[in-house]
Amino acid sequence: MQAHELSGAPWHHPVFWVAVAFVLFFVLFGRKIWGALTSKLDSYADEVRQNLDEARKLRREAEAMLEDARRRKEQALAEAKRLLESAHAEAARAAQALSDDAEASIRRREKMANDRIAAAEKAAVDEVRFAAADIASRAAKDILAREFGPYADAALIDSAISKLPQALRAA
């Protein structure tokens, strides 16, 4: 502003009247505005306090839930470790049982194979004996047929019958 505008009575200037209106406005409505403003700020502060209380409560609940989750995690890890150890032990027992079963099966099969071999050997020996006995009996028959005639058979039978009582006494 310029100096010539400020000269004269203060009520002749618009700045004076704006200041008066401003003061008058605050005198008339200041208490209502101040009351409304403070009540609004108080309600906002109460709301903030409630939100903070709720946040603290939620934080405590979250911490409790976190602690519970950690405890359950530790329990689950312990349970998993126990189950894993149990599974390892069970697997070792199963492997040992399978090994024992396989060993027993091998022994049974070996015994069966040995039994089959022994049976085959016995059958072969019996067959050879039978064949040898058959060959010997045929050879004896041929020799007897060549050496002795039809009359010699009767003499042999008579001789065998006469020796029979001695053989029975000796036995």
UniProtKB/Swiss-Prot annotation:
One Gene Ontology molecular-function label: proton-transporting ATP synthase activity, rotational mechanism
Disulfide bonds: none
Physiological role: F(1)F(0) ATP synthase produces ATP from ADP in the presence of a proton or sodium gradient. F-type ATPases consist of two structural domains, F(1) containing the extramembraneous catalytic core and F(0) containing the membrane proton channel, linked together by a central stalk and a peripheral stalk. During catalysis, ATP synthesis in the catalytic domain of F(1) is coupled via a rotary mechanism of the central stalk subunits to proton translocation.
Cross-referenced CDD domains: ATP-synt_Fo_b
UniProt KW keywords: ATP synthesis, Cell inner membrane, Cell membrane, CF(0), Hydrogen ion transport, Ion transport, Membrane, Transmembrane, Transmembrane helix, Transport
Annotated PANTHER family: ATP SYNTHASE SUBUNIT B, ATP SYNTHASE SUBUNIT B', CHLOROPLASTIC
Record's subcellular location: Cell inner membrane
UniProt-listed InterPro entries: ATP_synth_b/b'su_bac/chlpt, ATP_synthase_B_chain
Family affiliation: Belongs to the ATPase B chain family.
Domain of life the protein comes from: Bacteria
Organism: Granulibacter bethesdensis (strain ATCC BAA-1260 / CGDNIH1)
Chain segments annotated as transmembrane: 9-29
Keyword Ribonucleoprotein found: no
Membrane topology: Single-pass membrane protein
The protein's name: ATP synthase subunit b 2
GO CC terms in record: plasma membrane; proton-transporting ATP synthase complex
Location (main, coarse): membrane
Quaternary structure annotation from Swiss-Prot or TrEMBL: F-type ATPases have 2 components, F(1) - the catalytic core - and F(0) - the membrane proton channel. F(1) has five subunits: alpha(3), beta(3), gamma(1), delta(1), epsilon(1). F(0) has three main subunits: a(1), b(2) and c(10-14). The alpha and beta chains form an alternating ring which encloses part of the gamma chain. F(1) is attached to F(0) by a central stalk formed by the gamma and epsilon chains, while a peripheral stalk is formed by the delta and b chains.
Record's keyword annotation contains Manganese: no
